[in-house]
Amino acid sequence: MDNNNVLNQIGNTPLIKLKQASELTGCNIFGKAEYFNPGESVKDRAALFIIEDAIKNKIIQKGGVIVEGTAGNTGIGLAIVAKAYGLSLKIVIPRTQSIEKKKYLKI
């Protein structure tokens, strides 16, 4: 696995034992730490699947444009994956979206 490829980091997140929940239930309870994904969200997995499926089924190809209406982490995941595949991404977001998220989506 090429660890320098951002796409290989998606979904490669650790399990973390939830100590209190484990003690309360008498079972080992683990949570998947999705915030370790490049976009810090489980939505990175969805974005990777959507784009790879579209490429596989010849719905989009290198140089193509994706248009997404989003107010959240799906757009961030799509931005990361689209850039890695050489695709253009146009995101439509509400005017009320935070400045930080707008800046992050422009990367």
Give the location of each predicted region.
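PLP-dependent amino-acid enzyme catalytic core
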Residues: 1-107
